[in-house]
Amino acid sequence: EYDGEPNGLKIHKDGRIFVADHRHGIMLVDEKRGTIEPVIIGPSKQRFKGVNDLIFAANGDLYFTDQGSTGLHDPTGCVYRYTVAGKLECLLDTIPSPNGLVFNVRETELFVAVTRANAVWRVPLDESGPLTKVGLFIQLFCPGPDGLAVDADGNVVVTHPGMGYVWL
């Protein structure tokens, strides 16, 4: 029996199905056995605040947001990378409610919907070291950016389900 709170879902290039579950962390669905099991439940034997969305890089690394109940009052949401080697890395840990995330076309930048700050952040990615120069991509006039996508031309698409808007 599954008692989770699924938020996001992605299919890995090898066909495995991963779920970002607010309650249980990153889960793996086994269609053949009819099971769903935890893959990552938290950093250093702690539990996540409440994972929200996930995306795979071309090399197979998994990036995901840990939103929980964070916000401007508690800007401790995180973006994690789980490498193909099995290493969990916290890339950012000062985000007021990280939500959806997407790479640019070349995977040199990660865009993160920061729901409670009404913004989308741009995160330059560098495999050789820590993140630097994280910045504001767009400041919205209303609360709650959620899902993100990038089209073939590199345009970032931002959804706001509460208002029924999609921005390109």
Tell where the protein language model's regions lie, with residue ranges.
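Short loop/turn segments that connect beta-strands within beta-propeller blades
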Residues: 30-34, 82-86, 124-129
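Anionic-ligand binding region
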Residues: 111-137, 141-144, 148
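Conserved phosphate-binding/catalytic loop of the ribokinase/pfkB sugar-kinase fold
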Residues: 41
